């Protein structure tokens, strides 16, 4: 439970963050203290070699320098810069070898980026300092920690990557906060003090965020939700600096050639690799101090995606700047018709969506990678398996995003999706989401299934942007009398993992629903109704039969 933050954690091992380590003694990317003696230990770096005037006359002469401190420095030297200028240059920030290999070459061992528990991370936060919860909007409800929100007196929740869900920046400061305040109030019983959304990439709502942050706020969230990227956007927008940066350097000491380099030295370490940040790092942004904490994991032993997904695919998925925001506005779709043989839709093998027979469906993907439709899951995995071990490129190689080991049906779990009407969004933790729309005249043809590699979490939700937009219209037209969030039905749900040989999935899903809600009788819905009658008829309001999500 998160409640240990203010008491047990600090009684057992109170380690308040200190900015006493000088900025040149810590890796500018991950924050680890640097050392140059033992390459096998964390924090190892090679000291940059000084340029010697008289011995080196051109930039080509210094390209013998092999480590990134020097390579990056060479790249940043502008044409016309003399060696004397470079010699007198303000010292640049340093990076450890682990981060250099990971950031610049995409070479890393996941064991060097181990998960941290919430208990470990929270030790860096003094008792009286405000926490800002950071979560990824495209992956809601994943990354939202109910325990943190209910244990903070002035809770602040910031959703990142809003441009991957919302069409316009105005929704981040108006429609979304109203919707989520009502959502947490009526569905979780929480009074969240402030809810905001931002887009670091498009610079949406940064001023609104900064004005709502208290001094000495700590950014807390899971790995790769965008904490460090958000910090960098604030630094760039408001000329922020790292704490402990040499304050004796004044503007008149910095020439134009050095200014760009100086600004770059202030930025937080950002990468598509989870757990890059290893130590709490502080920044001065405008008149406020803000701290970037390492990401924490609910399960420190969870399987890293690197074991499942090919490195180039994982890089596409994780790099926010590669996301095509045109999809949010235009929503291009692929049509798939369900068959008796189990026709399925996939993006790289990250999942296989299997619609029920005779259903006609549209899929809009918000995940990078080429989609493909296979005859069935078994055939798909056989095809992906044949991609490996061939001397010549396989014609379907570009559609395979999983490692060789995962081209095996036993590595997958069968998720059954509870009944829905119209459209839903299927969310994959740390990957993204797709929109699934059932088209044509409504009829219940059976339950949808999605086969997902073991270790990847999945849930469903009603389309988020539609909920926010329609809720806001209802809220304003009623002059704030009607909630912007529907109260009478669940809006998110877990899937139901079943045995591959289970035939009566509809009866099994009811059994599993009753089991899941055994200690939450008050949330049970429609259990006295005839389930077949509920799903056989189209309703004005989606009944969302057997929807349930455990926060």
Swiss-Prot record:
Matching PROSITE patterns: G_CP (PS51721)
Localisation: Mitochondrion
One GO CC annotation: mitochondrion
Gene3D superfamilies registered for this protein in UniProt: P-loop containing nucleotide triphosphate hydrolases
Keywords: Mitochondrion, Transit peptide
Listed InterPro entries: G_CP_dom, Mito_lipid_metab_GTPase, P-loop_NTPase
Primary location recorded for the protein, binned into one broad class: mitochondrion
Gene Ontology MF, one: GTP binding
Keyword GTP-binding: no
CP-type G domain segment(s): 118-299
Mitochondrion as UniProt keyword: yes
Superkingdom, natural source: Eukaryota
Transit peptide boundaries: 1-24
The protein's role, per its UniProt record: May be involved in the mitochondrial lipid metabolism.
Annotated family: Belongs to the TRAFAC class YlqF/YawG GTPase family. GEP3 subfamily.
Protein name (Swiss-Prot/TrEMBL): Genetic interactor of prohibitins 3, mitochondrial
